[in-house]
Amino acid sequence: MALSGQDWRRHQSHRQHRNHRTQGNHQKLISTATLTLFVLFLSSWIAYAAGKATVPAPLVEGETESATSQDFNSSSAFLGAIASASSTGSGSGSGSGSGSGSGSGSYGLASMNSSPIAIVSYQGITSSNLGDSNTTLVPLSDTPLLLEEFAAGEFVLPPLTSIFVSIVLLIVILGTVVGNVLVCIAVCMVRKLRRPCNYLLVSLALSDLCVALLVMPMALLYEVLEKWNFGPLLCDIWVSFDVLCCTASILNLCAISVDRYLAITKPLEYGVKRTPRRMMLCVGIVWLAAACISLPPLLILGNEHEDEEGQPICTVCQNFAYQIYATLGSFYIPLSVMLFVYYQIFRAARRIVLEEKRAQTHLQQALNGTGSPSAPQAPPLGHTELASSGNGQRHSSVGNTSLTYSTCGGLSSGGGALAGHGSGGGVSGSTGLLGSPHHKKLRFQLAKEKKASTTLGIIMSAFTVCWLPFFILALIRPFETMHVPASLSSLFLWLGYANSLLNPIIYATLNRDFRKPFQEILYFRCSSLNTMMRENYYQDQYGEPPSQRVMLGDERHGARESFL
C-alpha cells in the first residue's frame, strides 16, 4: 500500500528524528571509547614514569655524608621503602648511613622488624634476616644485578609494566593505521567524497598514516630498549621522517581550518576558486613547508647521537636557533592561525543561528496576525534561488540573506557547514509556511551548525592537549636550565603521536558523510556503497528516497491524465 505524500513526509520526519537520536548515541559511544583509550594511555605512562624514576647516584669518595643523606631523603623510591619498614640501626665509623642507620666503608647498617627487605644505601647494601632483628652486612660486590643497578642510581622497569605500556602503544599504532586507512579508502570509493574540499583531509590522513607506519614503531623500540642500537644513519632518517610527518599533520590541520574559514566567510568567491588544481597546490605547499623544517638537521646541522656519558641516543638537533625556527613553524604559528580562524567560524555560526531565529520569529508573528510580511521588521516573502558551484557547495539566496550549504565533510558533525551573509534577511519557502520543506531543511541545517560549534571545541581541545606539552618542552630543553626526566619527555612525545589517532575520529567519524562509508567498509559491504550514499543524500535533500518520489510523481501524473 503506497503512502500519500503527506503521510510519507510525516513518516520521514519521525525517521529522521530517530536517526538523529541514534547518531547522537553513536557519537557518545565514540567519544567515550576515545576518552577511555586516552585515559588508559595516560595512566600507563604515569605508571611507566613512576617506575623509571631514578634514584641518586652512590656516594663517591670525598663527598660529604650530609649531602648524601639530604639527597637520599629527597628520593621518593627510598622513602617508600623506609616507610614500609620501621628501621633503627647503629654502627661505627665516620659516615652516617641512610635513614637512621649509620655505616662505614662499603657497608651500611640497618635493623628491621618486618619482613625481609633490602635497602640500598649510598655505601652498600643492607639486608635483614627473617625472624630475628640481627643485621646482615652484604658487600656491594655480592649483591644481585638489580640491586647493583639500584645502588648505581639506575632502575630496571618491571616486566609487567613494560609489557603493559608496550601493549597500549601497539593499540595506539594499530588504531591510527586503521582509522586513517579507512579515510583514504572511503574517499577513493565514494564518488560523493571525491571533491576538492576533501583533498586536505586525505593529505592529513596520509601524514598521520606515515606517522603510524614510519615513526611510531621505531619510537616504540626505542622506549623498550631504552637506548639506540641502530646506528647514526638510521637515526637521522628516523628523526627526519618524525619531524616531516608530524609537521605535515599539524600544517594540514591548519590548512583545513583556513579552507573552512574561507568557505564560510566568502562562499561565492571561494567556491569558484576551490578547484582540484588549487587544492593540490595547497597540499604541495603543506608538504614543502614540512620538508623545509625537517631537512636542516639531516643536511646541515646534524642530530644528537650520544649523550654526555657517551651512550648511544637518537634525538633531534638541539641547536637553539633551529629549535626556535622548528617550534614556531611546526606548532606555534599554526596554533595561532587555528585559534583565530576557529574563533571567527564560531562567531559566524553563532551569528547565523541568531539571525535565522529572528527571521523565523518575524515570520511566525506575520502568520499569526501579530505582524505583517510587509512590516519593516520582517523581510518580504520571496522565492528561493539555488545555484551549484560544481565543487560541492550549493548557494541559496533567500530574501536579503545569502546562505551556503557545504556538502563537503568538514567541521560539521552532520557533514555540512552553513554560512550566512547579510544584515538579517528573512527566510521563507515558496509556500510561505513554516512547515514547508524549505523550512524543515533550514532547521536541519541550523541544527547541524550547532553541532559544528561543538566539533570546533573538540578539534582545538584535542590538538592543544596533544601537542602543547611537547612543544613547551622543546623550547625549554635547549636552555638547559632544568633537568627533564626521560619518562616525561617520552610521555609528551607519545601524547603528540596520539593526535594522529584522534584526527580521523574528529574529522571523519563525527562526520556522517564518512561515518556511513566507514561502517559499510568495516562490514565488507562496498558493492552498493555509492548507491546507498546517493539515496541518503537524496533523502536528506527531499525527505524521501528516489523510488518513493518517482512513485508519487507517477501517481500524480496518472491522476492528471485521468482528469484531462
Swiss-Prot record:
PROSITE patterns for the chain: G_PROTEIN_RECEP_F1_1, G_PROTEIN_RECEP_F1_2
Region of interest (Agonist binding), ranges: 238-247
GO molecular function terms noted in the UniProt entry: G protein-coupled amine receptor activity; G protein-coupled serotonin receptor activity; neurotransmitter receptor activity
Motif (NPxxY motif): 503-507
InterPro entries (UniProt xref): Dopamine_rcpt, GPCR_Rhodpsn, GPCR_Rhodpsn_7TM
Sequence repeats: 89-90, 91-92, 93-94, 95-96, 97-98, 99-100, 101-102, 103-104, 105-106
Domain of life: Eukaryota
Gene Ontology biological process: adenylate cyclase-activating serotonin receptor signaling pathway; chemical synaptic transmission; courtship behavior; female mating behavior; G protein-coupled receptor signaling pathway, coupled to cyclic nucleotide second messenger; male courtship behavior, orientation prior to leg tapping and wing vibration; male courtship behavior, proboscis-mediated licking; male courtship behavior, veined wing vibration
Gene Ontology annotations for the cellular component aspect, listed alphabetically: dendrite; membrane; plasma membrane; synapse
Residue ranges, compositional bias (Basic residues): 11-23
Chain residue ranges for the region called 9 X 2 AA tandem repeats of G-S: 89-106
DRY motif, short sequence motif: residues: 259-261
Composition-biased stretches (Polar residues): 386-396
Residue ranges crossing the lipid bilayer per the database entry: 29-51, 165-188, 199-222, 237-258, 279-302, 331-353, 455-476, 488-510
Chain residues that bind ergotamine: D242, T247
Tissues in which the UniProt entry reports expression: Expressed predominantly in adult heads.
Side of membrane Cytoplasmic, spans: 189-198, 259-278, 354-454, 511-564
Keyword field: Cell membrane, Disulfide bond, G-protein coupled receptor, Membrane, Receptor, Repeat, Transducer, Transmembrane, Transmembrane helix
Region annotated Disordered, chain positions: 1-26, 367-396
One Pfam family it belongs to: 7tm_1
Family: Belongs to the G-protein coupled receptor 1 family. 5-hydroxytryptamine receptor subfamily.
Chain's role: G-protein coupled receptor for 5-hydroxytryptamine (serotonin). Also functions as a receptor for various alkaloids. Ligand binding causes a conformation change that triggers signaling via guanine nucleotide-binding proteins (G proteins) and modulates the activity of down-stream effectors, such as adenylate cyclase. Signaling activates adenylate cyclase activity.
Protein name per UniProt: 5-hydroxytryptamine receptor 1
Organism: Drosophila melanogaster (Fruit fly)
Source species taxonomy: Eukaryota, Metazoa, Ecdysozoa, Arthropoda, Hexapoda
